[in-house]
From Swiss-Prot:
CDD domains: Hb-beta-like (cd08925). Heme b binds at H63, H92. Red blood cells. The lineage of its organism: Eukaryota, Metazoa, Chordata, Craniata, Vertebrata. It comes from the Eukaryota. The keyword Iron applies. This is Hemoglobin subunit beta-2. Involved in oxygen transport from the lung to the various peripheral tissues. It comes from Iguana iguana (Common iguana). GO terms for molecular function: haptoglobin binding; heme binding; metal ion binding; organic acid binding; oxygen binding; oxygen carrier activity; peroxidase activity. The gene is HBB2. One of its GO terms (cellular component) is blood microparticle. PANTHER family: HEMOGLOBIN FAMILY MEMBER, HEMOGLOBIN SUBUNIT EPSILON. Residues 2-146 form the Globin domain.
Length: 146
């Protein structure tokens, strides 16, 4: 993947403003609410019976932070995302058996959450750069499945 200097700047500039625990929790909760079939991968998280329960669930919030922290690793390694996510791809494929389509779903929810939190800063150019990034990350996470 080739990143332009502008894309790299847009990604890193916005990322410097991101509240990882909040945005991560909101993105994961959003996916679990909007795509309820994804909840089957989180059966040990306790109460996921409603949007309110999901959004207030401490395990969802903690895992959302963990997920977005890993996403931050992609930003630190934009030129080597595939290798950055090799072990996570293996874990999600071989042990957790996560449908790789879910990586795309979470990426799309993340875009919506970023737009909601960072409105003016989330310009069309920034949106395009982040859309490219979530697609590259989803592809890297799905790599083990191919």
């Amino acid at each position: 993947v080739h990143w332009t200097a502008e894309e790299k700047q847009l990604i890193t500039c916005l990322w410097g403003k991101v509240d990882v625990p909040t945005v991560g929790a909101d993105a994961l909760a959003g996916m679990l609410v909007m795509y309820p079939w994804t909840q089957r991968f989180f059966a040990d998280f306790g109460n996921l019976s409603s949007a309110t329960a999901i959004c207030g669930n401490p395990k969802v919030r903690a895992h959302g932070k963990k997920v977005l922290t890993a996403f931050g690793d992609a930003i630190k390694n934009l030129d080597n995302i595939k290798d950055t996510f090799a072990k996570l791809s293996e874990l999600h494929c071989d042990k957790l058996h996560v449908d790789p389509e879910n990586f795309k779903l979470l990426g799309n929810v993340l875009i919506i959450v970023l737009a909601g939190h960072y409105g003016k800063d989330f310009t069309p150019a920034c949106h395009a750069a982040y859309q490219k990034l979530v697609n590259v990350v989803a592809h890297a996470l799905a790599r083990r499945y191919h």
